[in-house]
Design a protein with these regions (language model features):
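Residue-level signature of outer-membrane beta-barrel architecture
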Residues: 2-5, 37, 51, 71-73, ...
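Solvent-exposed loop/turn segments connecting transmembrane beta-strands
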Residues: 4, 20-27, 53-61, 96-101, ...
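Repeated loop/turn-to-beta-strand initiation elements of outer-membrane beta-barrel proteins
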Residues: 6-12, 42-47, 77-81, 115-123, ...
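Membrane-embedded beta-strand positions in outer-membrane beta-barrel channels/transporters
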Residues: 30-32, 62, 66-68, 106-110, ...
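Detector for outer-membrane/organellar transmembrane beta-barrel domains
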Residues: 66, 78-131
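Outer-membrane beta-barrel "beta-signal"
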Residues: 176-188
Length: 188
């Protein structure tokens, strides 16, 4: 969901997946809320809060607060492309064999692309890379891609892909977690 005005934009996303194969259940949560304030010449300031949990990576909750800025490289009635840079505070609780809680500061670089109001389809992508400022040799990445097709009568078919990577998880937890989804959505 999102809201745009002449200077402000707000976005919120919530994706939760539950997978059961045989008798093994796997949960994944990916949620965010962000705001941007448009300055002159398509520059902007931004803040964001992200929440993530993954049974695959043994993360009970990762909370990341980001502050930064960037520039819109494309900004018109049907598409936006932006790049951003800033700092992040990261707090994680892991459910590994030995429960671990970590707190760190990171530098982030990200980009977003959104194609909307096209005749038959929409595209959303959000990619962010993180380099830890307080932990040696730790890098993280988050990638989300959504492709939506208008199938008529306010219904959409949406293909989604999400990837989360951590170069240095605790206690030999998995470095990557990904999800591929196919959903049907509708507009009210």
């Amino acid at each position: 969901a999102g809201y745009d005005s002449e200077r402000w934009s707000f976005d919120a996303n919530y994706n939760e997946f539950l997978t059961i194969i045989d008798t093994i259940q796997t949960n994944r949560l990916d949620a965010s809320a962000s705001s941007r304030y448009l300055l002159k010449k398509y520059w902007f300031t931004s803040t964001s809060a992200n929440w993530f949990s993954s049974d695959e990576q043994e993360i009970s909750l990762r909370t990341t607060l980001l502050i930064g800025g960037g520039k819109y490289l494309l900004y018109d009635q049907v598409k936006t492309l932006q790049i951003g840079l800033g700092v992040a505070w990261n707090r994680e609780n892991f459910t590994t064999e030995n429960a671990v809680a970590r707190e760190s500061y990171e530098l982030y670089l990200g980009n977003r692309f959104h194609l909307f109001d096209h005749k038959f389809f929409t595209i959303k992508s959000n990619m962010v890379g993180y380099a830890s400022l307080t932990e040696d040799d730790r890098y993280r990445a988050s990638v989300n891609l959504d492709f939506g097709w208008d199938i008529g009568d306010d219904f959409d078919l949406i293909w989604g892909y999400g990837l989360n990577f951590d170069s240095n998880p605790p206690n030999n937890a998995q470095q990557t977690d990904y999800v591929i989804s196919l959903t049907i959505g509708w507009e009210l």
